[in-house]
């Protein structure tokens, strides 16, 4: 039986990230990004093999961009595409695993939009456009929140009036589930352990960041909550703050809820602390030049990350290893070293040479001999979405 091809789509409000995944090959035959959709500057960029190219598509919407992409995908797939996997940010409590998309699923995703107003409507745009263009192909939704539906109630409930949960779904959902699941499976494979008999602390660190406690292949706790704002310090997101900050700023500065929400999501985190940048690479460079804001931002980021990992350990029966993934987790030896140094009670120690070597896609163990396992594992959410899609086609 010839190997199968899955197109993976991740739609934002004005962008489409795409990858063609072949089940038999680790490299993507085709991948790219359509961005600034709906504007005169809309552009489609792609890589195929070692070649890169782009095409201006002025005023194109999601459907027009996908239509431009269609012949490219068919050509790269050798004329045979077997299905389309869609990343959907929020599945609420309705979806605990990947699901074939039909009218009922579309309406359920629409119903969860109030829980992810910036993401789910955009995800739906991509789904509806793709289903129009590829009506005969199976479409599968893979939810960021689904992996965390195994959280026990004591981990997902807030200490709020019960009616808010029962009537309005106010609870902790968690995100980055596809990434945490993928790297925990890879970690078990690398360590020679069974997924169903292993326990991991996972740190997905990028512009959005979260930690996760994974036991026997299930998420038992995670740092993000009702929204992706809860938890760690991130690129522009504050992470955890005093819940009374809203009323304090409204009372003392006269700020509206919208202004406070924008500040916490778009002006805080590494950017707010450093007053310089949300990019860890820039901050590390500026720290070397003596920039105090950059140094502080990195210190706060690593300390808060270590605190979160320590908190996640409450859900583990034993620790088989700590996993670093995501753009920062995969590429910042400094962040990994500083975080490990804060976790002295875990007896974590890193091998400096191994830590320095694991960047730009290099995976591997970075712990010093005789100390608990620490792994750097590049995430591959596109491949995981493709695998979930293929599983529903079998």
UniProtKB/Swiss-Prot annotation:
Alphabetically, the GO molecular function entries are: acetate kinase activity; ATP binding; magnesium ion binding
Question: What cofactor does this one take?
Answer: Mg(2+); Mn(2+)
User: Which positions make up the signal peptide?
Assistant: none
Q: Where is this site: Transition state stabilizer?
A: 176, 237
| Catalytic-site annotation from UniProt | 144
SS bond partners:
none
What CDD domains does this protein's entry cite?
ASKHA_NBD_AcK_PK (cd24010)
Pfam families cross-referenced by the UniProt entry: Acetate_kinase
Q: Tell me which residues bind ATP.
A: 17, 204-208, 279-281, 327-331
Localisation: Cytoplasm
Biological-process GO terms, alphabetical: acetate metabolic process; acetyl-CoA biosynthetic process
Q: Which UniProt keywords apply?
A: ATP-binding, Cytoplasm, Kinase, Magnesium, Metal-binding, Nucleotide-binding, Transferase
Could you describe the subunit structure of this protein?
Homodimer.
PANTHER family according to UniProt: ACETATE KINASE
Please give the family membership noted in the entry: Belongs to the acetokinase family.
Put simply, this protein is called Acetate kinase
Organism of origin is: Pseudomonas aeruginosa (strain ATCC 15692 / DSM 22644 / CIP 104116 / JCM 14847 / LMG 12228 / 1C / PRS 101 / PAO1)
């Amino acid at each position: 039986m010839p190997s199968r091809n899955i197109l993976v789509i991740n739609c934002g409000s004005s962008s489409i990230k795409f990858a063609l995944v072949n089940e038999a090959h680790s490299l993507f035959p085709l991948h790219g990004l359509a961005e600034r959709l709906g504007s005169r500057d809309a552009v489609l960029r792609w890589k195929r093999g070692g070649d890169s190219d782009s095409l201006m598509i002025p005023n194109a919407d999601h459907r027009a961009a996908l239509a431009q992409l269609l012949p490219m995908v068919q050509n790269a797939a050798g004329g045979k595409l077997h299905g389309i996997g869609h990343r959907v940010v929020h599945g609420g409590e309705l979806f605990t695993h990947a699901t074939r998309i039909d009218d009922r699923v579309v309406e359920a995703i629409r119903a969860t939009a109030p829980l992810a107003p910036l993401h789910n409507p955009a995800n739906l745009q991509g789904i509806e456009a793709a289903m129009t263009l590829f009506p005969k192909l199976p479409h599968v939704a893979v939810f960021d929140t689904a992996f965390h539906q195994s959280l026990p109630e004591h981990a997902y409930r807030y200490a709020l009036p019960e009616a808010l949960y029962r009537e309005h779904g106010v609870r902790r959902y968690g995100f980055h589930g596809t990434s945490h699941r993928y790297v925990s499976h890879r970690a078990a494979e690398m360590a020679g352990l069974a997924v169903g008999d292993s326990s991991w602390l996972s740190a997905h660190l990028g512009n959005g960041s979260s930690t996760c406690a994974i036991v026997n292949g299930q998420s038992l706790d995670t740092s993000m909550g009702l929204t992706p704002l809860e938890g760690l310090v991130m690129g522009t997101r504050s992470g955890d703050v005093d819940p009374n900050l809203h009323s304090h700023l409204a009372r003392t500065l006269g700020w509206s809820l919208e202004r406070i929400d924008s500040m916490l999501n778009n002006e805080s985190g590494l950017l707010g602390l450093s007053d310089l940048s949300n990019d860890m690479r820039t901050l590390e460079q500026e720290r070397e030049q003596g920039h105090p804001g950059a140094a502080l931002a990195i210190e706060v980021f690593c300390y808060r990350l270590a605190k979160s990992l320590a908190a996640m350990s409450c859900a583990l029966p034993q620790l088989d290893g700590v996993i670093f993934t995501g753009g920062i987790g995969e590429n910042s030896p400094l962040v990994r070293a500083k975080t490990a140094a804060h976790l002295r009670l875990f007896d974590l120690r890193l091998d400096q040479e191994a830590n320095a070597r694991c960047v730009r896609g290099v995976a591997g163990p970075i712990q010093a001999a005789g100390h608990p396992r620490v792994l750097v594992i590049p995430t591959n959410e596109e491949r995981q979405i493709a695998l979930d899609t293929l599983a529903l086609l079998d």
